[in-house]
């Protein structure tokens, strides 16, 4: 087993979350698994995760759950702190999986996003639940930005 500290905020009922967890294990790493619906992050942790990902609470919101409507979160005027309050009250509003590695923190949707922050390359192609293959060759270090 490769000694790497990786944490995944995981929902076992989510296919993307399961794929990302399997990809981490496929790379030879056993991550710390936080089933965030059972043990949601506290305010400080949630804010830290958002800052590390460089996204707003709105960008982390799940919009396809009844709670999204119930809290009136479709209204763009809802303040960041109020979105965070709703997420803390109802963690189902937090999109997943969030993965923390030494290379960064990301909301890994689609699951291939994991490759951007996975500290080691996949040893071989990983086959997702739907049969789609993720190739280790796609793992890049620093991305070259090419302007069109």
Residue map of PLM features:
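Non-globular targeting/processing and membrane-anchoring segments
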Residues: 4, 88, 93-95, 100-148
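Structural alpha/beta surface segment adjacent to cysteine/selenocysteine redox centers
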Residues: 7-12, 16-80
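Glycine-rich loops and low-complexity Gly/Arg-rich segments
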Residues: 32-34, 55-60, 85-86, 123-126, ...
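Compact, basic/aliphatic-enriched, mixed alpha/beta core segments that act as assembly/interaction modules
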Residues: 59, 70-102
